Amino acid sequence: MATHGAMLTQDVVGGKWYELFTSMFLHFGIDHLASNMIVLIAVGLPLENLLGSGRYAVIYLVSGLAGNVLSAAAELKTGDFAVSAGASGAVLGLMGAVIYCLIRHRGRVGGLSLRRVFLAVFLTLYMGFTNSGVNNAAHIGGLICGFVLAVLFYHPKECRSQHDRQTGWIR
């Protein structure tokens, strides 16, 4: 994995900054990929519906990068280096964004509820902290970044009307 674009903090510091990006698109097996994609579908589709494709993509990519930057910073501080890959920082960023949108909508958007999303985030973080080999810093960094970006990007009337114009939907 390290030779195919997974993130090694030592390499990033040495000039391979692109690993902060490429590692988001690599996974350590089908289970790793599937777990990220299931959450991506469950949370991502309703979020894209609210924000539109452009804002959604920005939140996904920037949250993934922010998670990887926090991960690299944590590794540099602790000296505990590991190969890192996966979309979970970006996916947790989407969950952070959905949390903000749900707060703005009093806890419900489509089939999502604030309680269920909080439970999913809690279980994800709990499993990460109780198992080895999980990049908790990337999860937390992505989650926080996604929430902050949603605060900046999500303006319900503007987002809905822009999305409606793009898709031709009338609500």
Predicted region positions:
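A detector for small-residue-rich transmembrane helices and their helix-helix packing motifs
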Residues: 1-171
